[in-house]
UniProtKB/Swiss-Prot annotation:
<protein>
    <recommendedName>
        <fullName>Protein VraC</fullName>
    </recommendedName>
</protein>
<dbReference type="InterPro" id="IPR016994">
    <property type="entry name" value="UCP032370_VraC"/>
</dbReference>
């Protein structure tokens, strides 16, 4: 898996195997159709070093916005880019906004924006 890390942005190659997608669909009782269920992309976030800073912090996911241009297929390699959109201190809360963009051959497939908060 290739990795490219830049301040506030990280790029990785990602893939969803046929077996793991079938297992996910079976677990959640979803019909398997050789496409990756959108919410399965949640497994990608911890793979990014940029997101590792949250591993020991008590953060709360407040919002998720998903824009799908093209469904992800199993056993295909995609380029996933995680970037920090913003970080704001509001009283005793830090609001983090991250965006995850998934592309295949320079074609935009999916964009996931998530907002997390950390209470200090």
């Amino acid at each position: 898996m290739q990795l490219y890390l830049k301040d506030g942005m990280e790029i990785r190659e990602v893939q969803f195997t046929n077996e793991e997608v079938q297992n996910y669909c079976e677990l959640l009782n979803i019909k398997y159709d050789h496409y990756v269920p959108t919410l399965m992309c949640a497994k990608l976030w911890p793979q990014f070093e940029l997101f590792q800073s949250f591993s020991k912090k008590p953060i709360i996911l407040k919002e998720t916005h998903i824009k799908t241009q093209q469904q992800l297929q199993v056993d295909c390699t995609y380029e996933a880019t995680l970037h920090k959109v913003s970080q704001k201190l509001i009283k005793n809360i830090i609001k983090y906004t991250y965006g995850l963009e998934i592309n295949k051959d320079k074609k935009h497939c999916m964009y996931i924006k998530q907002i997390f908060i950390e209470v200090r």
